Amino acid sequence: CEVSYNDDFIDPSKTYGTARDMDPKFESNNLVDVTQISIYQSYEHSVTYKRTYGISRELEMNLNVDEKVLTNYNALFESQYKLLPAEYYDIPSSVAFGEKTASTKFVVTFYSEKLVKAVGLEEASNYVLPIRGIPATDEGVVADSASNVVLLHVQMLRPVVTVQIPNAPGKLDF
C-alpha cells in the first residue's frame, strides 16, 4: 500500500528541521476526538496552541474552518467524515499569544443536544470540525501548514447512569 502526503498532514518519514521551523503549532494536530454527552445543551472543548521561539513578542493566529483539510483527510485515510455545519459550533476568529507567552488556549463550543436532535446520535458522531491557524502577519513567523491544522471529531455518547450497590450494608454508629 502506497501512501502520499499533502501539506495538511505530517509525513512521518520526512524530517522537518528544528522546532524553530515549526513555530507556532497546535498541541495536538490531525484528528482529535471530542467526547460529548448527547443530552448536554453545549460542550466546551479547549484547544491549546504552543510556540517555542519568538516569545519576546505578541503573535495573533487567525482561526479558519477549512473544508479542504477534511476532504484531504478523507481521501488519505479513506474515511467518510462530514463537515460539521456552522450552527452546531462556535469558535473565535483568532487566538493571541501575549508577549513572553509560550502557549495560549481557545475554546470551541459544540451544541451537542441541538446536533443530536437534528441528525441523531450515530450520524452526529460522523462530523468533524477542521480548523486551520494562519498567522495574522507573516513577518518573522514560520508557520508549518501541517502543525497548524487540527480536526475536531465529534464523538457523541449516550448518557449512562451507573448504580453501585455495596456488598455489605454499612454500619451506622450513633
Regions found by a protein language model. Name each.
Residues 1-90, 101-105, 114-116, 120-173:
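Acidic/polar, low-complexity intrinsically disordered N-terminal segments immediately downstream
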Residues 98:
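Charged, gly/pro-rich active-site loop segments
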Residues 110-112:
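Localized edge beta-strand/strand-to-loop motifs within extracellular or lumenal beta-rich domains
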